[in-house]
Amino acid sequence: MLRVAINGFGRIGRSVLRALYESGKRDQIEIVAVNELSQPEGMAHLLQYDSTHGRFLHKVTHDQEYLYIDLPNGSQDRIRIVHQADISLLPWQSLQVDLVLDCTGVYGSKADGERHIDAGAKKVLFSHPGSADLDNTIIYGVNHDTLLPEHRVVSNGSCTTNCIIPVIKAIDDAFGIESGTITTIHSAMNDQPVIDAYHTDLRRTRAASQSIIPVDTKLHKGIERIFPKFSNKFEAISVRVPTVNVTAMDLSVTINTNVKVNDINQTIVNASQCTLHNIVDYTEAPLVSIDFNHDPHSAIVDGSQTRVSNGHLVKMLVWCDNEWGFANRMLDTALVMKK
């Protein structure tokens, strides 16, 4: 059993805990503690009731020291609540923590990870790309086999790299990619205000529900980190749209091989049934973004939107639940780190 602590109980932290119980991995992973500065009442309430993912199937109660999750057999899981702002003072040693899932979005350097380790954890997995000095960055399904026992401070990438990189790999393996561009159409996030308010990014001073808002993205750097051969070959832009969850990615690539739409789509179908099973899914149904809410795949390719121009320019539409899919990959990567 892998003993895991969650640092940061926001959108991703809570999704990871819920996904553990819904994915059938609870017999392999035990959440022993959650570090969160908010009060236990709010932690329990937001775990039980979620505006995006609905009500948690298990009853959640709490006291000042623990969250309690009721199980179907009548027993309870007990999760220690910690309120510690200084990660170097976290009680990971006494709790015998094997792995910290750092879901704060605040920490992400090798030094940050080592502070968790100095506090008693054996390994750390960050929920965002982090700095370039980390031991490894894992996109599960693509390069998780590169994890080594000595890799102690690791990144799980981002929701968008987990979405697009498996698709890029499938197309590149089959046809050879020369270059590409990506537009991320991302749901609103909690760094955007409900009504206009101050922000260092002037576009993000504007009300999230009123506009389509361009934001900076380093997605191309994330691609290069996994595929160094694509250095200076990909560019990306991103916009935030007034929805609460699910992201669409518009991928355009120039490929070496002369192809037709069916060649591209069949490649994705084959990958979804083999090398990228449970990571990439494929559909041609006339679906919209909300239909992919709570989907555990990293990416869902909408084959009805695939286009090919002049045999070499390929455009694809790829969906993901940027919360739930990523949370499930955090758990997958955690189990690989256990080995």
Swiss-Prot record:
UniProt keyword Cytoplasm present: yes
Function: Catalyzes the NAD-dependent conversion of D-erythrose 4-phosphate to 4-phosphoerythronate.
CDD domains from the UniProt entry: GAPDH_C_E4PDH, GAPDH_N_E4PDH
Any one GO CC term of the record: cytoplasm
SMART domains named among the record's database cross-references: Gp_dh_N (SM00846)
PANTHER family to which the protein is assigned, alphabetical: GLYCERALDEHYDE-3-PHOSPHATE DEHYDROGENASE 2
Catalyzed chemical reaction(s): D-erythrose 4-phosphate + NAD(+) + H2O = 4-phospho-D-erythronate + NADH + 2 H(+)
Entry annotated with the keyword RNA-binding: no
InterPro entries: E4P_DH_bac (IPR006422), GlycerAld/Erythrose_P_DH (IPR020831), GlycerAld_3-P_DH_cat (IPR020829), GlycerAld_3-P_DH_NAD(P)-bd (IPR020828), NAD(P)-bd_dom_sf (IPR036291)
UniProt record similarity statement: Belongs to the glyceraldehyde-3-phosphate dehydrogenase family. Epd subfamily.
BP-aspect Gene Ontology terms: pyridoxal phosphate biosynthetic process; pyridoxine biosynthetic process
Subunit record text: Homotetramer.
Any one GO molecular-function label of the UniProt entry: erythrose-4-phosphate dehydrogenase activity
Active site: 159 (nucleophile)
Gene source species: Aliivibrio salmonicida (strain LFI1238)
Enzyme nomenclature, EC number: 1.2.1.72
Keyword terms: Cytoplasm, NAD, Oxidoreductase, Pyridoxine biosynthesis
UniProt binding sites for substrate: 158-160, 204, 217-218, 240
Identification of the protein by name: D-erythrose-4-phosphate dehydrogenase
Broadest EC class assigned to this enzyme: oxidoreductase
Site (Activates thiol group during catalysis): 186
Pfam families xref list: Gp_dh_C, Gp_dh_N
Compartments where located: Cytoplasm
Positions that bind NAD(+): 11-12, 322
